[in-house]
Amino acid sequence: MMGRCLFSFASKVCALALLVVALAYPALADTVEIAQGVQVTKRTYAVPTKDQPFFGFADKTAAQREEDDKFVKALIEATGSREKALDEVVKRGWRALGSGKYSEAALRFNQAWLVAPEQSVVYHGLAAIAQIRFGDLDFAEELFRVAQKQPNPLKMLNADYGRVLLVAKRPKDAQPVLEQAVKDTPDFGDAWVNLAHARFQNGDRDAACAAVDVAMKQRPSSNAAVDLVRLRNDAQCK
């Protein structure tokens, strides 16, 4: 990006873009335990703590911890159980993420962490925040790996994780994850499209074309469908 800016007409725009990248880039830190038996790398970003995974790992006062406890208690009482409370905040988190409301999405998944810090969906959701909001593929992958080990993973977990590995240009790592993803969600067209990409990038054209054939029958999303047409041409599938 720096090279492009040196020769760019719009130098002010490039300078601003570089500033945004610098602000978004995570600060390096140590490993922190964020649930019993669960440790992650402490990564923070230049945005309000509520917009960051795990509230930016901020040290909370006794009063703030008490407010968290009150929130969790009230939510459980309102919904009827801890499981239902988790389901409520998670649904709001995914809805906000799908609408591009990243601050709200982060807040909801952070609230899910307060409600049930051991659950897989907490790390799945915050991995999506790390990837989409901050472009931090390393942290996203770390959280996806945690999510794989925690209770009650969503069926979409491996599909989302495999996609991140593809975006990170790691098709060899992505393929086994995506092979499992299409077993978990055999009707999810996008997972088949991503698997086809991984197979093709790993040199297995025939297997890639086989995945293309399945993907075409599963109605992938519009963006994935465009990728599918391009991939089919590149792989010269029949």
Residues of each region from the PLM?
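Alpha-helical adaptor scaffolds
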Residues: 114, 118-186, 190
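N-terminal leader/linker segments that initiate helical-solenoid repeat arrays
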Residues: 28-95, 99
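Register position in tetratricopeptide repeats
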Residues: 98, 132-133, 167, 201, ...
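Bacterial N-terminal signal peptides
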Residues: 12-24
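Canonical tetratricopeptide repeat
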Residues: 125-126, 160, 194, 227-231
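TPR/TPR-like alpha-solenoid repeats
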Residues: 129-130, 164, 198, 231-237
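Bacterial N-terminal signal peptides that target proteins for export
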Residues: 2-15
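Terminal, low-structured helical/coil segments at or just beyond the last alpha-helical repeat
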Residues: 32-51, 66-68, 201-238
